[in-house]
């Protein structure tokens, strides 16, 4: 069976990796490499403190967090490094300390279903200083040891390399034929659309309409002369988070800009 995957972000690259394990499946990936959300995402994995009422959303986010554990194990079995995934814990900051107690109880109630949450604790500034020196702007915060973050560009690069799939770096146009699906003159038995915000444009030519819109995200990177590899992710109240990586790199963001369309201008 010949399968095309359009889009090589987190969804497309993961699909390519697992499909490549099927001996009877030939996988081709199309990705023009512009405006990929995975590369611009903060990559924080910590869904357990969400107070959204949408139970379907929470279930998806929770199972997504759990899935990384499975993915890391599968890649390790194949002898592939998983540097893209770092489980260093997460700090949550709130302006009102009573909100920390609420979130602590919420996470505690969810831990039986989601043991990945790990250790939970409300920490003082002095306790935090032992793990994240010079972090300011709070008296107490909530800590969960199971929090993690993913470096999106490295994730997709790792998965595509592990899959061995052929990657065609061009924008794909999809059409339906009597033999299946056609992309750039090639026929495919199945197609996986992993195009994110471009899904509406992709399906419009086939007569479908979907309620999908773009959201612009921007990160700012800083380079510090510190060993930040084990620093937890910091999630203050608001949109901007602090995401430490290895070798002194710290990212801040990401923005969530709903009215910018596909504008990729850095500002």
How should these model regions be labeled?
Residues 148, 167-182:
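A conserved short coil-to-beta-strand element within the FAD-binding core of flavoproteins
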Residues 44-127, 131:
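Dinucleotide-binding Rossmann-like beta1-alpha1 core, especially the glycine-rich loop
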Residues 93, 174-176, 241-244:
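A structural signal for short hydrophobic beta-strand segments in well-ordered beta-sheet cores
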Residues 4-6, 187-198:
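Short hydrophobic core segments
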Residues 59-63, 95-100, 142-158, 263-267:
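Short beta-strand to alpha-helix junction loop
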Residues 2-28:
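N-terminal Rossmann-like FAD-binding beta1-loop-alpha1 element of flavoenzymes
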Residues 18, 158, 162:
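Rossmann-fold NAD(P)-dependent oxidoreductase module
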Residues 14-21, 32, 43-44, 83-84, ...:
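Active-site substrate-recognition segment that forms the wall
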């Amino acid at each position: 069976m010949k399968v095309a995957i359009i889009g090589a972000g987190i969804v497309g690259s993961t699909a390519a990796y697992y499909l490549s394990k099927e001996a009877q499946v030939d996988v081709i990936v199309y990705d023009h490499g512009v405006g990929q959300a995975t590369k611009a995402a903060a990559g924080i994995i910590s869904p357990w403190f969400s107070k959204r009422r949408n139970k379907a959303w929470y279930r998806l986010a929770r199972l997504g967090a759990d899935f990384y554990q499975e993915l890391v194990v599968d890649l390790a079995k194949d002898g592939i490094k998983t540097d893209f995934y770092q489980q260093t814990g997460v700090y949550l900051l709130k302006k009102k300390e009573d909100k920390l107690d609420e979130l602590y109880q919420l996470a505690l109630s969810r831990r039986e279903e989601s043991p990945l949450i790990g250790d939970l604790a409300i920490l003082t500034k002095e306790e935090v200083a032992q793990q994240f020196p010079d972090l300011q702007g709070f008296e107490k915060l909530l800590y969960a040891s199971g929090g993690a973050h993913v470096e999106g560009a490295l994730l997709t690069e790792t998965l595509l390399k592990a899959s061995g799939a052929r990657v065609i770096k061009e924008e794909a146009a999809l059409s339906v034929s009597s033999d299946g699906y056609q992309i750039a003159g090639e026929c495919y038995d199945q197609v996986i659309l992993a195009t994110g915000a471009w899904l509406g444009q992709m399906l419009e030519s086939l007569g479908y309409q979907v309620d999908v819109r773009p959201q612009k995200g921007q990160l700012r990177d800083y380079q510090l002369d510190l060993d930040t590899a084990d620093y937890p992710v910091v999630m203050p109240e608001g949109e901007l988070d602090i995401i430490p990586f290895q070798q002194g790199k710290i990212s801040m963001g990401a923005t969530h800009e709903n009215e910018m369309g596909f504008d990729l201008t850095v500002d």
